[in-house]
Amino acid sequence: MNHNGGDATVVDPMAQKVVATIPVGGVLEFPTSDGAGKVFVNVDDKSEIAAIDVKTLQTVAHWPMKDCKSPTGLACVPGPKPLVSSCGENGVAKVLSAETGAEVASLPIAIGADAVLYDAKRDVVLIPCRAGELEVISIADAAHISVVQRVPTQEGSRTATLDPDTGRIYAMAAKFGPPANPGGRPQALPGTFEVLVIAP
């Protein structure tokens, strides 16, 4: 995904060449796949999810997300379950049908979400937020999707990865000072980087 280019580049790794460029439009954030021929990507500036058909190499849908500002992280739950998108600017998690784009749920979460992780063994979605919380969302029952736990982490920790076997989450963290320029982002202080390990 080309973040500011508004398109997706398809690369043949064996031939080491670009085989297609797929127009999507907008500022592209995190993509995910359903494993069955569709790729989905958050379009930050349009507050929508775009769907790409891998076989035809075309964008086939644009699904707007009402009341979602700056969608970044995105996870696709395999099977009949949904897409989960984190709206980082206004503290919302949007849950959409991966087939139709219809909204299934809209959940309040902490501000500054980025990554969205799916833990298949525990059937939960995990969203680390810059405000210092890890949101745990149960999707075991499609009719009752909800935030079931808010785990305190560290302010600024919003990107993480998951060990699918143990369920442990590894989140990047640091101490922050004031922005370098007024209105800018807080600056990480040298020598304060660490990895938070969160057990299920």
Predicted regions and their residues:
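Predominantly soluble domains enriched in secretory-pathway, periplasmic, or organellar proteins
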Residues: 1-200
